[in-house]
Amino acid sequence: MDPELLVSIYASTAVSVGIILAAAGLGSALGWGLICSKYLEGIARQPEMRPQLMGQMLFTGGLMEAFPMIVLGMSMWFIFANPFTGAALAAIGS
């Protein structure tokens, strides 16, 4: 087994995981910004709806925060149980 191949696979995986986690964090931050801005717009239009809007905002935010956690789990899978190394070993017959 060529050690340079494994180093290349691990390096590419690390860079890819970093990009994926950054995109998930950015998406989550933008999502929270949009949710909160719409919440404030709703309160400005109908102040008496504040408790109901707050509940909906927190529920939607919780659902939105599930996505980065799923992405984090998948990223940890790629880092610690990299499926590409097994495929590379099988392809070269080692």
UniProtKB/Swiss-Prot annotation:
The listed locations are: Cell inner membrane
Listed A to Z, the keywords are:
ATP synthesis, Cell inner membrane, Cell membrane, CF(0), Hydrogen ion transport, Ion transport, Lipid-binding, Membrane, Transmembrane, Transmembrane helix, Transport
Question: Which positions carry the signal peptide feature in this UniProt record?
Answer: none
What's one GO MF term for it? proton-transporting ATP synthase activity, rotational mechanism
- Gene Ontology CC, one term: plasma membrane
Which residue ranges traverse the bilayer? 15-35, 61-81
Principal localization?
Answer: membrane
Which cysteines are cross-linked by disulfides? none
Membrane topology per the entry is:
Multi-pass membrane protein
Annotated site (Reversibly protonated during proton transport)? 65
Q: What does this protein do?
A: F(1)F(0) ATP synthase produces ATP from ADP in the presence of a proton or sodium gradient. F-type ATPases consist of two structural domains, F(1) containing the extramembraneous catalytic core and F(0) containing the membrane proton channel, linked together by a central stalk and a peripheral stalk. During catalysis, ATP synthesis in the catalytic domain of F(1) is coupled via a rotary mechanism of the central stalk subunits to proton translocation. Key component of the F(0) channel; it plays a direct role in translocation across the membrane. A homomeric c-ring of between 10-14 subunits forms the central stalk rotor element with the F(1) delta and epsilon subunits.
Q: Give the quaternary structure.
A: F-type ATPases have 2 components, F(1) - the catalytic core - and F(0) - the membrane proton channel. F(1) has five subunits: alpha(3), beta(3), gamma(1), delta(1), epsilon(1). F(0) has three main subunits: a(1), b(2) and c(10-14). The alpha and beta chains form an alternating ring which encloses part of the gamma chain. F(1) is attached to F(0) by a central stalk formed by the gamma and epsilon chains, while a peripheral stalk is formed by the delta and b chains.
Family recorded in the similarity comment: Belongs to the ATPase C chain family.
Q: Which HAMAP family match?
A: ATP_synth_c_bact
> What protein name applies here?
ATP synthase subunit c
The gene for this chain is atpE
